[in-house]
Amino acid sequence: MRPAGYATAMNYSLRAKTGAEALEAVANSPFDKVELWWPWDTPHPSEQQMRQLVDALAKGRPENPRQLVALNLWAGDLAAGDRGVLHLVGPEEGADGAGAGTDPDAESGDPAITEELIEHLNVIEYLHRLTGVRRFNVLVGRGGRVLQRRQVRAFAAVAKRLARFEGIALIEPLSGIENYPVTSIKEAAPLVAAGGRLLIDAYHLAANGEDWTWLASRGAEYELWPEHIQIADFPGRGAPGTGDAPLEEWVNQLREAGYEGEVVLEHV
């Protein structure tokens, strides 16, 4: 089963109070495709915890498990306001967003990435082997409204390691978060240039007053073409139809222009 209409998958984390609650919702989902934020309070969950995710995907349908289409990387303590940790990785080298396009190699001692982050990415690769998930939302951290060079370098290092198993690092412009440097498509550009792909959340862009429908005129070869789309209505972040945003029209425009990815319901 798939969500009605133009959506293809459901995110079960936004409405959940805990990661365990999100996994329970996945286990009872009627849909074929699901998406999650990081469901554990540690970047290094145990084997048992990871197997609980696998079990949730397969519950009630062991021969045809639900597909995990995207997963947030660990982003710190979300309840405390964290939105990623890349602003804390490596030495500060200026706050001009420079460094896009560098090719850091963590294993050769590049300070762009820490051993803890490498261990987390090893967990991510293992989860990929368990579930097949390939798309990973990478939050860059609340280091200020200007993207720091070390954030770009760390993001590039993460994207490079994910690519070893055909993983894709997603960058998502957010709304309503103080001191977060990526709130528009333009601000995501240095991270796309560093090896990432754009994740569009229609609610966040509408909340920030950004019209993203111009992307349809650029076509699928455009460097900022979205890899992944999430939708919720605006205002309110409710289900489609609860607000004023022409979500179906926007999605159809991108489909007609060549978008072939997921359209994920992520609403309250």
What kind of region is each of these model predictions?
Residues 49-63, 154-162, 214-218, 249-253:
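Catalytic-core regions built around general acid/base machinery
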Residues 67, 228, 244-263, 267:
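P-loop/Walker A phosphate-binding loop and immediately adjacent motor/lid segment at beta-alpha junctions
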Residues 1-125, 195-197, 224, 252:
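N-terminal pre-domain/capping segments
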Residues 5-15, 35-37, 69-74, 136-139, ...:
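A cross-family glycoside hydrolase active-site/sugar-binding cleft signature
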